Regions:
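Signature of long, low-cysteine stretches enriched in small and polar/charged residues
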Residues: 125-171
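Surface-exposed amphipathic alpha-helical segments
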Residues: 177-207
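C-terminal motif of bacterial Sec signal peptides marking the signal peptidase cleavage site
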Residues: 16-19
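Hydrophobic helical h-region of N-terminal Sec-dependent signal peptides
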Residues: 6-14
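Secretory pathway targeting signatures of secreted, lumenal, and periplasmic proteins
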Residues: 69-118
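Positively charged n-region of N-terminal signal peptides that target proteins for export
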Residues: 1-4
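Short, hydrophobic/aromatic-rich segments at coil-to-beta transitions
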Residues: 54-61, 84-88, 147-157
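N-terminal, intrinsically disordered, polar/charged segments of Gram-positive cell-envelope systems
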Residues: 6, 22-73
Length: 207
């Protein structure tokens, strides 16, 4: 599903850029949601160094220098979509709870590096939101804003007809790259994994 959504985003943005439209697009709704909230509201102080160390041992750092890194439970395993694709994806052993990392590149949008540097992140997130709104897989789609790895992100939230949640962060990191991070799963899993992803994302591997 992620491969098709990312591909749809690339196609939509390419068409948008080809039209030479510079109209500002706003695809975010800053109202609070039960699915997505900023990391600052999710994080809590460690009760002891022992508890912190125990939690550290229960997680692993996944990702790459190209796509960035996040923490996930140590029990999660890497998998590859049957349709192919270059995403980095980990799951809990089911096809329900999944985290995906990727980075948008200039060539995907058929634009120059100079144009990529000026590309508005809102445009990218708007395209993702639109592709989900047009998909028959989702019963509800909305936008919000949050923070991931210290960066302001435009977040696209969706609820699948199966009841599964999908949260997608789109943001530009300090190296100029436009990042894509998504988390999908059931509500209970997201309560734990969402703040973990938001607080741990980094473009370098931090042990």
């Amino acid at each position: 599903m992620k491969k098709l959504l990312i591909l749809g985003t690339v196609v939509t943005i390419s068409a948008f850029l080809a039209s030479c439209s510079n109209k500002s697009q706003t695809a975010t709704d800053e109202s609070s949601s039960t699915v997505v909230s900023s990391s600052s509201s999710q994080e809590t102080n460690s009760t002891s160094s022992a508890v912190s160390e125990a939690k550290k041992q229960e997680t692993q750092i996944i990702g790459s220098n190209e796509y960035g890194f996040v923490k996930v439970p140590k029990s999660w395993v890497r998998f590859h979509e049957v349709e192919g694709g270059n995403d980095i994806q980990y799951c809990d052993g089911t096809d329900i709870n999944i985290v995906t990392l990727n980075t948008f590149k200039a060539e995907q949008f058929n634009i120059s590096e100079e144009e990529y540097a000026k590309l508005d992140v809102v445009t990218v997130s708007s395209s993702i939101l639109t592709s989900k709104e047009q998909s028959s897989d989702f019963s509800k789609v909305w936008g919000s804003k949050s923070t991931i790895g210290g960066y302001e992100a435009y977040v696209v939230n969706a609820i699948a007809k199966s009841g599964k949640y999908l949260v997608t962060w789109v943001f530009r990191s300090n190296d100029g790259k436009i990042r894509y991070v998504s988390l999908e799963g059931d509500g209970e899993t997201l309560k734990t994994i969402l703040p973990m992803v938001e607080s741990s994302w980094s473009n370098t591997k931090v042990e």
